[in-house]
Swiss-Prot record:
One of its GO terms (molecular function) is exodeoxyribonuclease VII activity. Bidirectionally degrades single-stranded DNA into large acid-insoluble oligonucleotides, which are then degraded further into small acid-soluble oligonucleotides. The lineage of its organism: Bacteria, Bacillati, Bacillota, Clostridia, Eubacteriales. It catalyses: Exonucleolytic cleavage in either 5'- to 3'- or 3'- to 5'-direction to yield nucleoside 5'-phosphates. NCBIfam families: xseA (TIGR00237). Keywords: Cytoplasm, Exonuclease, Hydrolase, Nuclease. It is an enzyme of class 3 (hydrolase). It comes from the Bacteria. This is Exodeoxyribonuclease 7 large subunit.
Length: 400
């Protein structure tokens, strides 16, 4: 018997009917660990359920998701009630979840949180230790697998933004056994042998076990002790590793890390223009301040001009001289008037004026005025003072 040749669609439809009509596959209870968890804006929840060997894609529609009494998390162990369905267009199958209950936190997830808590308590995540990335680096070191999307994305972004930057790649294992040691060797290489301005630790997205190399205690301390600033760019935006918390900066993706560390040429030009403008403004301010100081100094000097001061003092001296002359003249005039009055009195009392009226004054040899005859003796020499002179006379006869 010859079988009919089927189209791809017919094959998918046939498998879909087999699966959907199977009693067991319509009433599954499956346990595993949640990974690749995504909450869609529509309200649907997409994730994978995995164990040590396998994984299966799952979806929980909004009408069932609203009934959950806890929030799903990466690494969480759960047990789901679901039916297996076939996506006809792609020929893939997935579990359609009706209900989810906790089955315990995944061991790796639990180990991650334990290490994160320990390192946080040891202080190596503290913001005070975070260093700023260089604004205009010249050489960029990258530690990642030598092939893959991560290294391509980082290099493409850096070269697109600024072709003048030097890029040095340290090819390292980023997954599996000894991966953490390989990354540690890369950090030491750049710190000891190559002078770079910043280091990117990069890896593409994956499950928690695929990113586990970046959840290593020794690697955390190597990053912490690096003298060169580090950027952690591991996985997708929803993925977090210990290296994210200890690095100086976390980038949500490798491409974003390339953006963070590489200033574009236009940014550099804009920065130079801004600095030029800043310098111009600073010089203008300095000039205006200096001009203001000079103006103030000029006004001060003008107010204290020696010539002006001398002229002012001359005016003051002239004024004082005039005042002294006035006061002196007034005092002299007053004294003159007083002298005239006194002279008039003296003239009135002057004996010589009396002589002018025919009187005379007799004085002895000691020029003492003789008022009485009894003061004379015979042969005394006396001086007779008259209006126009004096004569000496010997007393010969005294008549009393």
């Amino acid at each position: 018997m010859k079988l009919k040749t089927l189209s791809v669609g017919e094959v998918n439809n046939y498998v879909k009917k087999l699966v959907e009509n199977d009693f067991i596959l319509k009433n599954l209870n499956v346990k595993g660990e949640i990974s690749n968890l995504k909450f869609h804006s529509s309200g649907h929840i997409y994730f994978s359920l995995k164990d040590e060997n396998s994984k299966v894609n799952c979806i929980m529609f909004k009408n069932n998701a609203v009934n959950l009494d806890f929030r799903l998390e990466e690494g969480m162990k759960v047990e789901i009630k679901a039916r297996l369905g076939v996506y006809h267009k792609e020929g893939t199958y997935q579990l359609y979840c009706e209900n989810i209950k906790k089955a315990g936190i995944g061991e790796l997830f639990e180990e991650f949180h334990k290490l994160k808590k320990e390192l946080s308590e040891e202080g190596i995540f503290d913001e005070k230790y975070k260093r700023a990335l260089p604004k205009f680096p010249k050489r960029i070191g990258i530690i990642t697998a030598k092939t893959g999307a991560a290294v391509r994305d980082i290099i493409n972004v850096i070269q697109r933004r600024n072709k003048s930057l030097d890029i040095i790649l340290y090819p390292a294992k980023v997954q599996g056994e000894n991966a953490a040691d390989s990354i540690i060797e890369g950090i030491r290489y750049f710190n000891n042998e190559k002078s770079v301005d910043v280091i990117i630790l990069g890896r593409g997205g994956g499950f928690i076990e695929e990113l586990w190399a970046f959840n290593n205690r020794d690697l955390a301390y190597e990053i912490f002790n690096s003298r060169i600033p580090t950027v952690s760019a591991v996985g997708h935006e929803v993925d977090f590793t210990i290296s994210d918390f200890v690095s100086d900066m976390r980038a949500p993706t490798p491409s974003a890390a390339g953006e963070l560390v590489s200033p574009s040429l236009q940014e550099m030009i804009n920065d130079l223009l801004n600095k030029k403008e800043f310098l111009h403004r600073a010089i203008d301010r300095k000039f205006l301040n200096a001009k203001r100081d000079v103006d103030l100094l000029y006004k001060g000097l003008k107010g204290n001009n020696p010539k002006d001061i001398i002229e002012k003092r001359i005016k003051e001296v002239n004024s004082l001289e005039e005042k002294l002359n006035f006061l002196g003249k007034r005092k002299i005039d007053k004294a003159k008037d007083e002298l005239i009055a006194l002279n008039s009195i003296l003239q009135t009392l002057n004996p010589l004026n009396t002589l002018g009226r025919g009187y005379s004054v007799i004085m002895d040899k000691e020029d003492k005025v003789i008022n009485n005859v009894s003061e004379l003796k015979k042969n005394d020499m006396v001086k007779v003072i008259m209006k126009d002179g004096s004569v000496n006379i010997d007393i010969k006869i005294i008549n009393e």
